Amino acid sequence: MFDVSEAAYDKFMGRYSVRLAPVFADFAGIDAGQRVLDVGAGTGALAAELARRDAVVAAAEPAPTFVAALRARLLSVDVRQAAAEDLPWPDASFDAAVAQLVVTFMSDAPAGVAEMRRVVRPGGVVAVCMWDGDSMEMLGAVNRTQRTLDPSQPTPEQRTLYRSRETLEGLIGEGAQTELLEVESEYVRFEELWSTVIDGAGPAGVWAKSLDDEQRAAAREEMYRQVGSPSGAFTLVGRAWAVRTTRA
């Protein structure tokens, strides 16, 4: 699902995650000198923001292509190829563990969050965030396009878990604090957006790559309609639920 180049991921989702990273880091209360683990670091949007804050940063990422990109880009970060469910650090190694736009894609999210708790010291922070269903306008447009062309396609809630406040709070558990974060991304024209979907990562990219030429043309026209048939530059909004707790 994420077997794509760093450039393809960044064009599709990185443009949002780079903007989300400082807002999420503020929510998690990350300051200089803290030992912070970025779980599911991807191409490094959040890890780079944490490093800019002079935190002592480590990163776990399962995809080999992203691990290589992280190591090349963020020389000060301790990058390890690892899944969230099996983090290769001792107990209480960090002041905070954070996961941006990741928990939906963990093979076992409760186990992943339990591992985040394990590696955080007592009194430290565990924080996650995920897009809020269709209110992430770009993904919402993709999802509505899919369902318009094929009504048997699942809704965002059916397709992926942990895209609502309630499910994320349930995942984090007792003491959860929640905030809805908002970012924007600008596109110079519709073709810029459409090219990111065709080459993109995650479920949207898998779907786009499965289309034949006729289906792809129909999908393009429907998605153009879903984003308001823009004639020039336009902006899409992404909203994400962020949830944090303090380890007892």
Model-identified regions with their sequence ranges:
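Conserved catalytic/acceptor-binding region of the Class I
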Residues: P110-A111, R117, R121-V188, A204, ...
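Class I SAM-dependent methyltransferase SAM/SAH-binding core
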Residues: R35-L87
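A short acidic, Gly/Pro-enriched loop at the edge of an enzyme's catalytic core
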Residues: E85-A97
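A short SAM/SAH-binding and catalytic strip from SAM-dependent methyltransferases
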Residues: D95-A109, D132
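Conserved class I S-adenosyl-L-methionine
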Residues: M1-Q34, A45-E49, P64-A69, R73, ...
